[in-house]
Structure formats: C-alpha cells, structure tokens
Curated annotation (Swiss-Prot):
Sites bearing Phosphoserine, chain numbering: 116, 194
Record PTM text: In vitro phosphorylated by PIM1; not affecting PIM1-dependent nuclear translocation.
The protein's name in its UniProt record: Sorting nexin-6
Annotated compartments: Early endosome; Early endosome membrane; Cytoplasmic vesicle; Cytoplasm
Residue numbers of N-acetylmethionine PTMs: 1-2
Residues covered by the BAR domain: 203-406
InterPro entries: AH/BAR_dom_sf, BAR_SNX6, PX_dom, PX_dom_sf, PX_SNX6, SNX5/SNX6/SNX32, Vps5_C
Keywords: Acetylation, Cytoplasm, Cytoplasmic vesicle, Endosome, Lipid-binding, Membrane, Nucleus, Phosphoprotein, Protein transport, Transport
GO term, biological process aspect, one: negative regulation of DNA-templated transcription
Molecular function GO terms recorded: dynactin binding; phosphatidylinositol binding; protein homodimerization activity; type I transforming growth factor beta receptor binding
SUBUNIT field: Forms heterodimers with BAR domain-containing sorting nexins SNX1 and SNX2. The heterodimers are proposed to self-assemble into helical arrays on the membrane to stabilize and expand local membrane curvature underlying endosomal tubule formation.
Stated family: Belongs to the sorting nexin family.
CDD domains: BAR_SNX6 (cd07662), PX_SNX6 (cd07292)
Length: 406
C-alpha cells in the first residue's frame, strides 16, 4: 500500500472548520460575550441557541441563553437601520437566509439513483453530500454568530434596548417574515433610494476625507464583488476536479478488481492515488471557500453597509444645504424666520453628529478589514503550501511503489 498523507477525519468535520471559520477579526470584550452554542435544523427553519455572558448591569443575570430564528435576526438588523440615532454608524450586515435546498436536492437525487451504483460508490457519495450539508449548516450558524458578535463589540449598538431584548427575553419575539406587500414596499423604497442616491452623489462633499472615502468605497465594493465571483468559480473548479478524480479512481478500482493480473494491481494502486488526491483537492476547495470566498462575501455586505452610511451622511448634507437656502428665503421675505432657523439648526446638528461618528466608523472599518484579510490570506497561503506538499508526496510515493513493482 502507498504511504501518503494521513487520511484522518474528513476536512468538513475538523474542529478548526467550525463556527469560527469565518474570521472578521472581531474585538472581544469580556463585559459582553455572545456566541451561538447550539443550532437545530427543522425542515426549512434553523433554531439558534444564543448564549450570552455579561457583567453589564443592564442584564438581570450574568449568563443566559435564548432560542432565536433567522427572522428575529433580520428584525434586529432592521431595527438598527430604521433607528435615526444610528444613522452615523456602520450597521453590521444581516446574516443571509439559511438555504439547504441544493444539498437536499442532491441527497434526493442520490437516493433515486442508488440502484445504478455499487454499494461502495453510494456510501462514499452519501457521506460526501452529508458532509457538504453539514458544512453549509456550520457556515450558516457562523454568519449569524458574526452578526451578533459585531453588534456586541460595538460601543453604541451593544446598548440598544432591542438587542438586549433579543439576547435576554426567553420567549418567542413573535417576529414574522415580510409578506408580499411589505417586500413590494421595500422594493419601491430601494428604487427611491437609488434615484435619490444619484442626486446625492452629485453633491460635492465639504470634507475631503468623506469625498475620498466615497470614491474609494465605490471602487472597493465593485472590486470585492468581482473578486467574490471569481473566488466562487475557483472553488467550484477545485470541487469539480475532486469529483473528476473520484470518478476516475472509481473506474480504475472497478478495472483493478476484475482480475489479479499485474495490470489490475497497477490499476488498484493508481486508483488509490486518485482517491487520496481527491481528498486533498476537496480540502483545497473547502479552505479557499472558508478563508477567501466567505471573507469576500462578508466584506461585500459590510462595504455596502459603509456605502449606506455615506449615503445617509450625504442625504443629511443635502438636507442641511436645503435648510440654509430655505432660511435665506425666509429672511428675504421676513416670513416664518424662526421656524426656518429651528429647522436649519436641527439639520446642522444632525449632519455634524453623523459626520463625527461616521469618520471614526470608517477608520475602524479599514483597520478591521485589513487585519481580517491579512490573517485569512496568510492562513490560506500556508494551507495551500501544505496541500501542494501533500500532493507532491503522494505522487512520489506512488511512483516509488509502481517502479518497485516493475
């Protein structure tokens, strides 16, 4: 038998591929620690057990857990977005909706085609699809945990009453998903926001820092979007290669078991090479997905949240400029001057408040994303080297065995 890499546990069930796989370099704070300690999938729903440890006086207990569903996470996110007090902050992006349809469909098709496979082929494919389902499930849990950790780490958002209710209230929050009418309303709101964004984007910013950030984030968001799509194609290519190795290895194994001749022994040894190479290629795909693709997807959403912050500030700037014009007109006509002055002062205060917090938010965003990308890219490079050395070792061992038999 060939001496290759230690097969060990499957790459999707390794401990370090769990809930902490998606890294955004969060700053932890012992005063408030939130994690998802457990999760249960029930048909189309996932129930998350949110575990909290806190020494803050706002909570009745120091440690407690509640069960939450995806819709309740969305409710919490939307409550931040809709709160005018948080207009000057980057709202952590909402976690994506759990989607296991593709994995379930693959498992169903596998069951339907069981009769056309050998028992070994069916068992191997079933294990791989179940591992794929588990990986998606873990990733879903991780995305929801990252959202809560980002909120818990934020000095302002962590004080929010709705966040405390989400963490501590041990009953159902009675939150439902949006119906068709509400989704249509959201669609029109986004249309209006897009049109308004075009108007707002044409306004020259009075602060060079924000003008630079607006230009940079627009380019950055587009580049991350493009990189995310290409990263997905790359991981799919590695996964396809692993699937091809599996099919080639299975065919060679079938040929090798037909007889006990030297050529059949050769087929069996090469079949083993393809099987072990398949595992490495699958690990490469999984590592690239976790360390790069997921990170790009997260920062694609967070860069959009940063763009939304700049939109709110620009909108406030336009309102402030319009209030100044209205005040000038009121003074010229000597009519409703007090009302115009009050409106102008409120717009000025709002704009200055948003600008003050937004500047620090954007600086923190840069620090956070640079640290996250540096950490993940270094780890990915180390894993790629490890897998490349593993592949080389497998090929050398295989050649040594085959040459020794000839």
């Amino acid at each position: 038998m060939m001496e290759g890499l230690d097969d060990g546990p499957d790459f999707l069930s390794e401990e370090d591929r769990g809930l902490k796989a998606i890294n955004v370099d969060l700053q932890s704070d012992a005063a408030l620690q939130v994690d998802i300690s457990d999760a249960l999938s029930e048909r189309d729903k996932v129930k998350f057990t949110v575990h909290t440890k806190s020494s803050l006086p706002n909570f009745k207990q120091n440690e407690f857990s509640v069960v939450r569903q995806h819709e309740e996470f969305i409710w919490l996110h939307d409550s931040f977005v809709e709160n005018e007090d948080y207009a000057g902050y980057i709202i952590p992006p909402a976690p994506p909706r759990p989607d296991f349809d593709a994995s379930r469909e693959k498992l169903q098709k596998l069951g339907e085609g069981e009769g056309s496979m050998t028992k070994e082929e069916f068992t191997k494919m079933k294990q791989e699809l179940e591992a794929e389902y588990l990986a998606i499930f873990k990733k879903t849990v991780a995305m929801h945990e990252v959202f809560l950790c980002r909120v818990a780490a934020h000095p302002i958002l962590r004080r929010d009453l709705n966040f405390h209710v989400f963490l501590e209230y041990n009953q159902d929050l009675s939150v439902r998903g949006k119906n068709k009418k509400e989704k249509l309303e959201d669609f029109f709101k986004n249309m209006v926001k897009s049109a308004d964004g075009v108007i707002v984007s044409g306004v020259k910013d009075v602060d060079d820092f924000f003008e630079h950030e607006r230009t940079f984030l627009l380019e950055y968001h587009n580049r991350v979007k493009d990189a995310s799509a290409k990263s997905d194609r790359m991981t799919r290519s590695h996964k396809s290669a692993a699937d091809d190795y599996n099919r080639i290895g299975s065919s060679l194994y079938a040929l090798g078991t037909q007889d006990s001749t030297d050529i059949c022994k050769f087929f069996l040894k090469v079949s083993e090479l393809f099987d072990k190479t398949r595992k490495i290629e699958a690990r490469v795909s999984a590592d690239e997905d976790l360390k790069l693709s997921d990170l790009l997807k997260y920062y694609l959403r967070e860069s959009q949240a940063a763009k939304d912050l700049l939109y709110r500030r620009s909108r406030s700037l336009v309102d402030y400029e319009n209030a100044n014009k209205a005040l000038d007109k009121a003074r010229a006509k000597n009519k409703d001057v007090l009302q115009a002055e009050t409106s102008q002062q409120l717009c000025c205060q709002k704009f200055e408040k948003i600008s003050e917090s937004a500047k620090q938010e954007l600086i923190d965003f840069k620090t956070r994303r640079v640290a996250a990308f540096r950490k993940n890219l270094v780890e990915l490079a180390e894993l790629e080297l490890k897998h490349a050395k593993g592949n080389l070792q497998l090929l050398q061992n295989c050649l040594a065995v085959l040459n020794g038999d000839t």
